[in-house]
Amino acid sequence: MTFGTLAVISVIAVLGPLLALPKRWHQPVVLGELIAGILLGPTGIDRLPAGDVTLTFLAQIGFALVMFVAGSHVPVRDPRLRESLRIGAVRAIAVGIVAAALGVVIANIFGTGHAALYALLMASSSAALILPIVESLRLGGLPVLQLLPQVAIADTACIVALPLVIDPQHAARSALGALAVLASAAVLFVGLRHLERTGARKRAHDVSEERKFALELRTSLAVLFGMAALAVSTHISIMLAGFSFGLAVALVGEPRRLARQLFALTEGFLGPLFFVWLGASLDLRVLGSHPSFIVLGVALGLGAIAAHVAMRLIGQPMSIGALAAAQLGVPVAAATIGTQLHVLRAGEPAALMLGAIVTIVVAAVGGALAARAGLVSAPAIAQPKRPTTSGDVL
């Protein structure tokens, strides 16, 4: 690990958004970063040492921050989420049932034995991808409102369940670790809400702002790293630690100042570093020697789309179903954890990412079709902003 490596990654962090620059494509910035990592890794010129201990550790910090941001973006406080909760929950469960059947079929065809993992991937939805598309296209109407809880439920459930299904031999240990992390997140939520209601947060914020202490950022990083340490000690991925902490913050209310600080830290450096490292960790040359995994990746992507589009049978427009199929966080986490635990076959992590790319492309098309179909409204869907007098939570 050298400053030259960091300089290259920082340049990629600048160039990564170029792929997402055309607004009509609605492609996430991370695609450019992943592609850059792939080109710098063993698939391309092999100049980025993804196995470097220091780089890997920095990437894990970025992973925790990326999952925290994803959790904080779940619109759990949006009143429209509660209004459409029932139909959204029904559709999320129905997608899971269809995905379970498809997972068994795909696992049997390819002989991998990962039916549960494939089902989880195909049932997942990425709030971090879907909500920006909804906002940029100004999508609205009842079908879009019903999409919110469906995505929130699927995103949360799949991320919580992933550590259990990716390593079933240690499912009991993983379950206990997951419970410990989730219990810690629940305690954090209670504590954050208490600080908010008693005004302690406001007083600390005022002192921090006046004295330039950056208490919000320091406190949040301390909590995040503490939860990551708990996750590692209980043999659980830091993915769950970051995501559950993000949900706890979202339940209290997305803090504007903290959101800006963590956005700068995550999107400016550690997030791109993680995605570049992930791309460099994927040896896509294996797909050339195992072409069946190319078919597996396409099958997973198309299976996810089919499972979500099938909700047309219970009233969801096909374009919205295609949009709901967008995946990112769960496949990225599965590829990362599977590689670290050595539970996936050579080329399988790349196949998971290929499937995610297929869903992203189709989701962008689905969003555009929904806009053309007139599913548009003036207000964008976003996390409700807190009153300006309430400041930022710790």
Question: Where are the language model's segments positioned?
Answer:
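Membrane-interface junctions of multi-pass transporters
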Residues: 22-25, 29, 39-87, 206-296
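Intrinsically disordered, low-complexity non-transmembrane regions of multi-pass membrane transporters
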Residues: 7-10, 186-219, 254-259, 372-394
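Hydrophobic alpha-helical transmembrane segments in multi-pass integral membrane proteins
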Residues: 3, 45-47, 100-106, 157-169, ...
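Structural signal for the N-terminal portions of transmembrane helices
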Residues: 3-10, 52-62, 146-155, 161-164, ...
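Alpha-helical transmembrane segments of multi-pass membrane proteins
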Residues: 12-13, 17, 37-38, 42, ...
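Transmembrane alpha-helices that form the ion-translocation and gating core
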Residues: 80-140, 288-349, 353-374
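C-terminal ends of transmembrane helices
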Residues: 12-25, 68-83, 128-140, 190-205, ...
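Structural signature of hydrophobic alpha-helical transmembrane segments
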Residues: 1-11, 51-68, 111-127, 176-188, ...
